[in-house]
Amino acid sequence: MSELLQRVTALARAAKAASRAVALSSTATRDQALRAAAQALRAAEPAILAANAQDLAAAQAKGLTAAMTDRLRLDHGRLEAIAVACEDVAKLTDPVGEVTEAWDRPNGLKIIRRRVPIGLVAIIFESRPNVTVDAAALCLKSGNACILRGGSEALHTNLALAQAFAAGLAAAGLPTEAVTLLPFTDREAVPALGSLRGIVDIIVPRGGPGLIEAVVNSAKVPVIKHDAGICHVYVHAAADLAMAEAIIVNAKCQRPSACNAAETLLVDAAVAASFLPIVGRAMATQQTEIRGCPRTCALIPTASPATEADFRTEHLALVLNVKVVTSLAEAVTHIETCGSHHSDAIITADETVARSFLAQIDSACVYWNASTRFTDGGEFGFGAEVGISTDRLHARGPMGIRELTTWKFEVVGTGQIRG
């Protein structure tokens, strides 16, 4: 066993032991810890922002993209939002112990299906430091412990955030090992975590294709993927074009570095001549580059030709792919071929067409007359989120506290034996 694997295993074993205490703790205790963590984050703001400045300086020296730098950056407002998110999670209804089904058998057995924590959740993520606290808060609320491995570009920020959160755990009398951040970012830590079958119960990777592939290929424990967000907005022939303009500007430009930002706009040929010039002007105002099909380039002189690779790329920047399609069927085929099954939207006043789109698009979240930017645990009413799963098993879409539970069956008898 390598020295790194030994270190990771020791930290994971301690977190696993702490998971037992968290699972058996009361709702009041976990909520107290969350509120105390929020206050500790506020009190530690100078230290956290100083650590973040250190990471930002290193990121700029390394030449990280604007999108990556934006994901990394913290300021007073973003840190306050992180603290408020902890308090919001504390206000959520505790899923642990919830009875989801109950029934009586003819032989008199009473069977109950009850929600219980998963155990130890490993979360591997890249530059966005708010994930450190969001993940810790959701795991704690749902009765789990977590072991976190962040990206090297955010190490100092993540350590400062984790230290503040640990103060909240201690204030409530919970073991600080219940939220464990690996204090190193060696690449070998990823397969090391994934090898700990029997200690780590699930792994949730959040990041780019390289990270996702590395985790999936090496893990010996179950993986729930937070995959790429190649999201689409399809403007149908029966769309309200003013609504469509507002939605595409929001979906693309509000926060282009987010995984739920739109990457591709599909426009029905019937409205292309009237709508695409509107799109061109709106994107110019937002300083957004358009990469389009030949018809798009003819209608938007500032657009540059799109490649096939563009339509399969999560830009995470102010770049919008645009393609003219001739039918709903062509739009669906494009999304199913080039998309990532994350979030896709149709803009139309035709309910029949909308219902067909919602049924045919095999994505975690599908929208009718709304921005893809709503794919978010907070916007769905889940509180913060651990990730947005594009898988089909156990969890799909924003992963809130219920998605961090499993269940067990309680069977109550009066002496029954099986014949």
Regions found by a protein language model. Name each.
Residues 1-110:
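N-terminal Rossmann-like NAD(P)+-binding subdomain of aldehyde/semialdehyde dehydrogenases
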Residues 5, 127, 134-145, 160, ...:
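ALDH superfamily catalytic-core signature
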Residues 18-24, 265-267, 317-326, 341-346:
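Short, well-ordered beta-strand elements within core beta-sheets of diverse protein domains
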Residues 25-29, 96, 172-179, 254-261, ...:
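Flexible, glycine/charged-enriched surface loops at secondary-structure junctions
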Residues 32, 278, 328, 333-418:
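C-terminal core of ALDH-fold dehydrogenases
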Residues 91, 100-242:
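Rossmann-like NAD(P) dinucleotide-binding subdomain of oxidoreductase/dehydrogenase enzymes
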Residues 234-238, 265-269, 325, 347-349, ...:
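Short beta-strand-to-turn element immediately C-terminal to the catalytic PLP-Schiff-base lysine
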